[in-house]
């Protein structure tokens, strides 16, 4: 689960990290009045969306009057911001963050992530702040410094000092960096984070370190023990179909193709998309119905797939382990009848009671194409999507 920048900075402040004073406004009037609350004569206004690249898209602006703040808020509130990280529809803007201005001398990068290969939290730092870290990693990987956190010992001050020296920090900046590093490490563990980034972490004209941005991603599997963070969830930033799928414990990700896929198991779902692509098709989605695929969940899965108007055929690929294929077949039949599916449906069943499941489908009288193998299923659904079935 992602947080907005203003929410991330609230967390930073709780852990004693240096952040700008700011107000998250929901109306143009609130945004304009924020200038009086914050004081000063120059402010930064930022559209709040779960995407990077806001500055290049016009979603971040330096302003010098309340009128400019109000104009910016009117421009973006209720509209969608399109950046290189969003689709063509963009993300809806429901809040504007108004912040005090910071004089910048140098931009750095500081972030942390769970590294699956080492099974450790890894901190990354770089002198190349203010640009996409992925670009730095690709073009100049030697400029990314790392500190691996031992899960038993935790983050250590010497690791922070080592990074600070390599970043070229000196004097009081080393102490400030150490405090920021240890605060972030504590927050990462206590709040069950999966990723955090400060890009940029700046050195001000006065020589102090300051967190100018905040990107935070929380481990969705740990939200049950983070009720306060769960309340920060903004469903408007998610694809409507993905949000609906989550309510039914379905793992759904929208893609750009025209072949809907319904599969049990994430690995099989990825393999299914690969083989559809191999045979010339374009998957419209990733959809994992999970191990406990009931008729109700299959019905909802169909509804979600068919809500994508670009879908011209559906491939159901089920491997029966704990779940019996005959029960899945009954669920598919019930779903097709209830939803009123008008497009071709190809179904491949393997495993527990697969033969019985195939018989149930054959006896249903519905136009469901039974596949004998995964290759056959992919070939059939690609043909059907092209109208050759």
Curated annotation (Swiss-Prot):
Mg(2+) binds at residues 199, 213. SUPFAM superfamilies: Glutathione synthetase ATP-binding domain-like, Succinyl-CoA synthetase domains. Pathway: Carbohydrate metabolism; tricarboxylic acid cycle; succinate from succinyl-CoA (ligase route): step 1/1. The keyword Transmembrane does not apply. GO terms for biological process: succinyl-CoA metabolic process; tricarboxylic acid cycle. InterPro entries: ATP-grasp (IPR011761), ATP-grasp_succ-CoA_synth-type (IPR013650), ATP_grasp_subdomain_1 (IPR013815), Succ-CoA_synthase_bsu_CS (IPR017866), SUCC_ACL_C (IPR005811), Succ_CoA_ligase-like_bsu (IPR005809), Succinyl-CoA_synth-like (IPR016102). Residues 9-244 form the ATP-grasp domain. ATP binds at residues 46, 53-55, 99, 102, 107. Signal peptide: none annotated. Keywords: ATP-binding, Ligase, Magnesium, Metal-binding, Nucleotide-binding, Tricarboxylic acid cycle. It catalyses: succinate + ATP + CoA = succinyl-CoA + ADP + phosphate; GTP + succinate + CoA = succinyl-CoA + GDP + phosphate. Coiled coil: none annotated. Belongs to the succinate/malate CoA ligase beta subunit family. This is Succinate--CoA ligase [ADP-forming] subunit beta. The gene is sucC.
